[in-house]
Amino acid sequence: MGNVILSSVHLLPYRTMAYNNAWANHRLLAACLALTPEEFTAKRTGFFPSLRATLNHILIIDHFYVDAMEGGTLGPAAFADPEPCATVVALKQAQAAVDRRLLNIVEALDSTGLQRIVSVHRGETIQRERMDRLLLHLFQHDIHHRGQAHSMLSGTSVSPPQLDEFFAVGEAPLRAAEFAELGWTEEQVWGAMDART
């Protein structure tokens, strides 16, 4: 793509994906609040052995990459404790905080920032990636592991929430209560573009 100047329309998908990522985390963790502590920590089939381990993995990877996008050098220290949050309440608060940091990054992006090289500290090496590619990588990572957690929820007393919808106009009333909890409006998510188009 070189030094192509991107319009706000081209930046919009990154904004909306960041909002969708935060919304999906909010929805999934809100459902998990109804789990018993035993259900939250019980061994289950998945890449990680429990809901707690899976959801904490999403959190620490978000910390790892968001710190790099902010220009930090946290690096592998992000993985020092694989399960920093012992409860769903603590996890929901911590995830919301890192989601806000990611939203702040994306809200501040312009075409130059989207093409900026991010230094990802990996211990003995520093990986250099463009911001746009790193954002897409992080969104895909979170989607992947939320899907695993969603499947694990099927084996509990809590019904898995719907996570397979995006921001369809006709479904705005269905997400209005969650947007209110998050302090969002449709116009905020869609930027200067008409939220109804």
Regions found by a protein language model. Name each.
Residues S119:
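Active-site-proximal loop/hinge segments within enzyme catalytic domains
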Residues A180-T197:
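Long, intrinsically disordered, low-complexity Ser/Thr/Pro-rich regulatory/activation regions
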Residues H10, T36-P37, A86-T87, L109-S111, ...:
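General structural signal for secondary-structure boundaries
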Residues G2-Y19, V189-M193:
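Extreme N-terminal tail/first-helix region
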Residues G72-R116:
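Helix-adjacent hinge/juxtasegments
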Residues S8, R15-A80, R122-T185:
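Short, contiguous alpha-helical
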